[in-house]
């Protein structure tokens, strides 16, 4: 799971002046951060059409030069503001458009680059959650204290502080009960004398009383589609939102809509449909451009059934010109929190930086031959029928080609379409390399439209992309033209088509567990519906990114299922990897599996069976490893999960780079973990020597075995961290890497690797340290080092070993079993950190030996003749030795695989 980084349009450094643009380049609001004048406290002029937010922060150490405040608003870009020292401590000021209601902020400490969108190593002060301040009047001022999550106000410049007193939430629990949460929990509402509920016309709603739970009871039911306000004397009015009511059976029965949403382009008409049950009005805005200019065309949507809104217009005008197609659009949605402009969550493309959706005739984006596009398996001679037939290679789009010197499309989708590319040593790279390696699927790190990269900039930028902006839109920075929304769609399809033509399937990394910010398009359209909240109205943060999506709510579930099936059907994708899948409820993932496999029974579905923090979703409903049995039952090819048991067993805990595992440190104590993974998570303690995890899988198809992924250190970096980089340790380090890979490739389950593991990928910082979380590191850290492959290099030799492992696995059904029993895997011998076992598949029998010790060990072959296909340095489909019997010597730090003749 990657860290959340929100999109930044950052500063240009001109002498000592930083210019920050917090929405678009032409909407700076006068935010020119100039040097402090001696003896004067920093101020900032606020131009007409803007309002101002000032944040004071006090740090006991008095040191502010390694800190800043990350601020954002209106779902737009974020900006990092450095502190100006003042009598209170430090202060920042930001001007925002006058229609801004809330501003989000994070006080960041331990910044390596204060004032810039660099998040590596930062520590959030006060709380890990995103914080928000509600603006009032032309100027809002808050005071913060280091280590304190509260916001304060002051009448004397910060000498005395009072908790900021505001109505934190007015929650419609039912149509007649409004639960009020105050920022100061000690404040109780005891009388109606200073309380009013106002409807959209400002008329008072009759009130019955107040119960002992700070709940206001109305005399008449409220209409969820009307914009009610709660007024309490001496507080700013707040909109009433049905946060709790959203989860009631009454709401679900009245507003769960199962029809098509989004834009539908027909031969004669174009229809628009949006689900916004709490809206009092919705207006469609049409733009000629995806980024610049104002909308001159507006259409009022009509209220439809179950909370939907719709508009249908003629596709062509009187002159035969398109009214909508290839133009851009947003919705202005009026709810209890005001009128906010939002991008349609169902938008299929967007303008640069995703601020406006695009209306497309999708057929016009298809490359030539697209109607015949299909994943036909590797080289046409290998069938991927079960998950266990797959061999997955995880890659970031930019990493793949950014260092291919003769690529015309460095860092772009189209780099996957190029053939004949070679590195400086004449070794095939790019797509040709993948075909030679033999993997069956590429797993693309997030390639939907994410927030953290400025698509309008030609400057080098990098992010993994785990900060979703527009889920159904391809990321624009990987297209050759990010401004024209048609290009990214067409080029994404070309990428998929080229990989399919090479016999390689495409798996998309999807991140439906959270959005880049809670101030998202979802929340502008239906405030508080799409996210989980704690009992006191604070966003639940099981993602570790400030928010989490409420997948258990029917319309969130519908969006997730609709989104996945859209990508599958429109882009011919062959599978999906779910980030932090533990934050999705079981019902949602079951429905995803059913719909995806109804369209393509061979599609792969897998995810991280854990969360990124505490969540309000019940543990019994989480799609996590402990619930893998509840999720899949006895199903083969259901929803697979990453096997962290074998991962840590092979190389040591990912939470401690100095820890070593069975393969990297000959730790016998980790052997049970390894054997648990060898049998695909099946319950069989006789095989594991008594070890069992907290979960079990009835089928190896539902378990992803791996030792490296984009998260954490690379396998090679872990080995080098412990063993050093001296030439004297090179042979043993290479052996440990090969043994680790061999364990994954000879285990039952689905083999998975981070791209470049097979060429000893390293992520080394400029100072020589190893980067374990390179989500926003430089290209130099993240790129695949293709030029490391030469005919004599250890990287090339290691790649050849991986190639042989993959080929042997593909030629050996016993390693790809979809169903097993207690007799499938049998221990032959155990001798410390050396184990020999058999895998039996009918008449096919393998003897596999893992020797993690540094000395050779003798293993006696069972009766019959055996052929050796894999040893410590060689692997493939041609026998290394044939017709072997009796005792065999197994080299130290190696895997040997014998097949019965």
Predicted regions: what is each one?
Residues 349, 396-571, 589-600, 604:
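Substrate-binding/active-site clefts of carbohydrate-active enzymes
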Residues 360-364, 369, 593-594, 599-760, ...:
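Conserved alpha/beta catalytic core and glycan-binding cleft of carbohydrate-active enzymes
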Residues 698-866:
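Loop/helix patches that line or flank the sugar-binding groove of alpha-linked glycan CAZymes
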Residues 104, 880-901:
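C-terminal beta-strand-rich structural cap/linker in extracellular carbohydrate-active enzymes
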Residues 31, 35-61, 87-174, 217-271, ...:
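The feature marks proteins involved in alpha-glucan
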Residues 65-75, 183-205, 280-298:
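Short, surface-exposed alpha-helix to beta-strand junction/turn motifs within ectodomains of secreted
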Residues 61-65, 100, 182-192, 275-281, ...:
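Short proline/glycine-enriched turn/loop motifs at strand-loop junctions of beta-rich domains
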Residues 20-22:
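C-terminal motif of bacterial Sec signal peptides marking the signal peptidase cleavage site
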